[in-house]
């Protein structure tokens, strides 16, 4: 049986090649394998997808490209929500 991560990796590769961006495989310090393209880096998104079981199950149950693209958008919004309070709370004008 194939690992769900292999299927996820294949979907991201397919999505990257369809979008026209040149994709290449990278490995992060903690061993995550992700993709970089001319646009965004998918490593953090993949990590977020693995942390959210509902989002991950959506991808595994409905393996269409549109479901995967929607899940990536949700993961990206979640990442922005995590980072936004930190950016707003930092005042670079303090001396």
From Swiss-Prot:
Secreted effector that partially suppresses the host cell death induced by cell death-inducing proteins. Keywords: Host cytoplasm, Host nucleus, Secreted, Signal, Virulence. This is Secreted RxLR effector protein 20. Belongs to the RxLR effector family. Disulfide bonds: none annotated. One of its GO terms (cellular component) is host cell nucleus. Residues 1-20 form the signal peptide. It is found in: Secreted; Host nucleus; Host cytoplasm. Its main location: secreted. A motif (RxLR) lies at residues 47-50. Has the canonical translocation RxLR motif, but lacks the canonical EER motif, which characterizes most oomycete effectors identified so far.
């Amino acid at each position: 049986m194939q690992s769900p991560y292999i299927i996820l990796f294949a979907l991201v590769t397919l999505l990257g090649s369809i979008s026209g961006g040149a994709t290449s495989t990278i490995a992060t310090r903690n061993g995550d394998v992700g993709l970089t393209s001319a646009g965004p880096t998918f490593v953090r998104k993949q990590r977020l997808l693995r942390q959210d079981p509902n989002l991950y199950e959506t991808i595994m149950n409905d393996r269409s490209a549109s479901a995967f693209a929607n899940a990536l958008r949700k993961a990206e919004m979640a990442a922005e929500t995590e980072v936004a309070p930190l950016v707003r709370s930092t005042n670079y004008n303090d001396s």
